[in-house]
């Protein structure tokens, strides 16, 4: 342990040699050096486990009055504290960046998700070096640090296997160990995983019972066991950030079946039931009012009868997904308890990084990629009914209806993305620390925010905020430690001023009052939003209106004006200004002012390259293009992928099958268009080519396929429908193999190229692109869904 006098405001702690006698011979009896002491935090510093779920609304969990069983959250709440006024930013990456840095999301460059980054300081997705992360601070103070799960704080141009890794968890963020994914969402059965900065495959397949949440728990338990076995006197900081319950809602059928019939009455009735449970549980004041359903959300009774069983099943699957997640979180906590370390482990269990996701359309979806590509009409009620038993399975990439998201945000208005209202930002949070909190099973209603976590952890550990990190002077934390509330439920709230903003949805909280304005509805992206000055502001008195049910702006215009001015002051202070609700401009790197990896219309790739995101590969959608590969065929029955992009839910692959050159185009997992040469390729060196002649005339059209060997055509084929917008949210491109889920009918294990070697692969796109025909709002809608 570092001496008590060691200053911890300069990190890393400087090495200061102790003056003393220097002898010539080490055998001299006057030779003396102080013993080497490993760096440790102050005595008694707790272990820290921060759990962050994804896309879980305030009203989902039984811990906060919901219908979805979360016995682990319930157990922690019974022995700890429940915070019913804890807030996030209303969106994924901004919440995560704010959590890990103790500063507002715009202060650390995350006014929006990384795909929308601009050159503006509040939206560039680049954390300034003046705002060091919590894990880095803890590591420099002697903590062991680890992260498991989702990281969406890496800009697309930094997310290739070549980094640079400054923004990666195991790079500059400060985690000594990372196991998880770098994206906004993941296929729970076939995720694109990283260990440290290196891509790795899941340890087993979906058919063998793989699920990401279970895997994350296994890895976390293993790491904690090893850490305590080898360094028992060193506390750990573990960040367990699940991909659940973000879509796709993947969970084994038996978990979803636990909720058979629970949601048959529909979202209106479910919302009413949750509201009454919340009041009975004391989670919200007894006098609370339930805000009326907005007209943008259809009533359950107005949904077609043939859709209701499908919609109910969507919610059953989501419920099973959340309970399954809670169960595996319990395994991690049980492992800590079995080692005798639970009493001095500070646990934050944050049930959601924002409100529930209303990005699944009114009907929900079986394969989100259909909606992402503007092809939701392919998922007819008849189709959805035919796959109702497959929701949540490896064959699905599913999401639930907007109506369920609204119900899961009970008792508040709106959902994820809507930073103006509590439905987007208020997330139930549990704090458990037996050694530091005497109170058990109590409610805390002080206003708190995700930026309060970092200062709380430092105070609990007895570590000061650093003034310098890596030679750079630090700006102070913008959050407030919650420790004052741990053992005093009546303590006045210390975090009494907070702005909120996301794509123009904005507001401010000050000493019980909130002034808010919704600028954009998450699922209504037709046309441009109104000018900011025309937004209608609302005013709520939180002392008597917990749920923001009664807008009193017309009764108290002076108070509204006061808070509007306060919002502008805070927005200016924290880089929120200029407000930015642009759509297509922010998705085009050149217009947004951010770098891009890919330039020009050609790209050379080589054997062994893989885990390339769509941002790492030239865009071949809505245009003619070709692939040419130089290969050395060693065996006449050579088999495997030359190059593949995407997976089961959409993509393409050029491959060899028993020596035959083949191509497959997979449209949404619904249609597979295959082209196959009749003859084998001779042993020897060859140039093989795939050419796609796009029909033109719009987006997502078909085209003619030609396969050639050494310039001679060997097969022709046809693709009728193509993806206009995206292959996948997290599947990748790979050379010499397929990865994740297979594009074609081959298995992943059989996709590895054998009997042939690849010298290079070159992609070339034509000049007939129809990308300019993509509606800017469609681009915006797509990007907002994948976060």
Enumerate the language-model features and the residues they cover:
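Formylglycine-dependent sulfatase
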Residues: 1-533, 537, 542, 546-565, ...
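Hydrophobic alpha-helical segments
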Residues: 460, 546, 570-573, 764, ...
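Middle-to-C-terminal accessory/interaction subdomains
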Residues: 560, 568-587
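Extracellular glycan-associated modules
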Residues: 578, 583-787
């Amino acid at each position: 342990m570092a001496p008590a006098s060691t200053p911890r405001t300069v990190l890393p702690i400087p090495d200061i040699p102790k003056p003393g006698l220097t002898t010539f011979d080490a055998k001299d009896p006057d030779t003396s050096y102080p013993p080497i002491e490993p760096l440790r935090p102050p005595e008694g510093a707790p272990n820290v486990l921060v759990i962050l779920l994804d896309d879980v609304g305030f009203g989902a969990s039984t811990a906060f009055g919901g219908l979805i069983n979360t016995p682990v959250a319930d157990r922690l709440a019974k022995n700890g504290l429940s915070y019913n006024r804890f807030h996030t930013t209303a969106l994924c990456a901004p919440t995560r960046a704010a959590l890990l840095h103790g500063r507002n999301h715009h202060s650390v460059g995350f006014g929006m998700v990384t795909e929308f980054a601009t050159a503006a300081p509040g939206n560039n997705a680049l954390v300034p070096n003046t705002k060091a992360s919590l894990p880095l601070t803890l590591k420099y103070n002697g903590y062991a640090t680890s992260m498991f799960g989702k990281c969406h704080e890496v800009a697309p141009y930094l997310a290739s296997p070549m980094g640079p890794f400054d923004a990666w968890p195991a790079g500059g963020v400060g985690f000594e160990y990372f196991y998880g994914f770098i994206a906004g969402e993941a296929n729970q059965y076939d995720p694109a995983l990283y260990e440290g900065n290196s891509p790795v495959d899941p340890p087993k397949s979906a058919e063998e019972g793989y699920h990401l949440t279970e895997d994350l728990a296994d890895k976390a338990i293993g790491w904690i066991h090893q850490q305590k076995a080898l360094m028992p006197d060193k506390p750990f900081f573990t960040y367990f950030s699940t991909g659940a319950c973000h879509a796709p809602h993947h969970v084994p059928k038996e978990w979803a079946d636990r909720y058979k019939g629970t949601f048959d009455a529909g979202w209106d009735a479910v919302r009413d039931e949750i509201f009454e449970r919340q009041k009975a549980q004391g989670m919200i004041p007894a006098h609370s009012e339930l805000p009326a359903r907005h007209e943008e959300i259809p009533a359950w009774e107005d949904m077609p009868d043939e859709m209701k069983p499908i919609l109910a099943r969507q919610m059953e699957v989501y419920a099973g997904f959340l309970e399954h997640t809670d169960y595996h979180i319990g395994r991690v906590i049980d492992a800590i308890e079995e080692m005798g370390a639970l009493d001095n482990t500070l646990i934050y269990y944050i049930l959601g990084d924002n409100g529930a996701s209303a990005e699944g359309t009114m009907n929900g979806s079986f394969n989100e990629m259909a909606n992402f590509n503007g092809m939701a009409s392919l998922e007819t009620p008849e189709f959805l009914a035919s796959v109702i038993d497959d929701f949540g399975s490896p064959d699905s990439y599913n999401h639930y209806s907007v109506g369920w998201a609204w119900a899961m945000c009970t008792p508040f208005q709106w959902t994820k993305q809507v930073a103006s209202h509590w439905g987007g930002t208020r997330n139930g949070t549990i704090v458990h620390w037996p050694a530091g909190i005497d109170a058990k099973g109590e409610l805390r209603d002080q206003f708190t925010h995700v930026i309060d976590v970092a200062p709380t952890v430092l105070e609990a550990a007895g570590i000061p905020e650093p003034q310098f990190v890596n030679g750079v002077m630090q700006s102070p934390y913008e959050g407030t430690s919650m420790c004052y509330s741990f053992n005093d439920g009546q303590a006045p709230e210390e975090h009494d001023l907070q702005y909120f903003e996301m794509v123009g949805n904005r507001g401010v909280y000050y000493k019980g009052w909130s002034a808010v304005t919704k600028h954009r509805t998450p699922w209504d992206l037709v046309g441009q939003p109104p000018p900011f000055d025309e937004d209608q502001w609302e005013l709520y008195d939180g002392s008597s209106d917990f749920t923001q049910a009664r807008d009193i702006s017309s009764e108290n215009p002076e108070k509204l004006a006061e808070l509007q001015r306060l919002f502008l002051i805070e927005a200016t202070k924290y880089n929120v200004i200029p407000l930015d609700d642009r759509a297509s401009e922010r998705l085009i790197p050149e217009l947004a002012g951010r770098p891009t990896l890919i330039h020009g219309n050609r790209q050379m790739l080589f054997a062994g390259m893989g885990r390339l995101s769509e941002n790492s590969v030239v865009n071949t959608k809505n245009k003619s293009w070709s692939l040419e590969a130089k290969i050395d065929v060693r065996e006449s029955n050579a088999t495997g992928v030359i190059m593949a992009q995407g997976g089961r839910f959409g993509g393409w692959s050029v491959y060899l099958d028993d020596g035959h050159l083949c191509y497959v185009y997979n449209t949404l997992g619904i249609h597979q268009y295959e082209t196959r040469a009749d003859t084998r390729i001779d042993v020897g060196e060859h140039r093989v080519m795939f050419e796609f002649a796009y029909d033109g005339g719009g987006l997502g059209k078909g085209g003619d396929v030609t396969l050639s060997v050494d310039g001679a055509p060997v097969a022709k084929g046809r693709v009728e429908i193509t993806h206009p917008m995206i292959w996948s949210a997290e599947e990748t491109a790979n050379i010499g193999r397929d990865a994740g889920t297979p594009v074609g009918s081959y298995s992943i294990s059989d996709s590895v190229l054998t009997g042939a070697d690849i010298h290079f692969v070159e992609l070339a796109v034509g000049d007939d692109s129809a990308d300019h025909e993509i509606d800017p709002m469609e681009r915006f809608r797509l990007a907002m869904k994948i976060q």
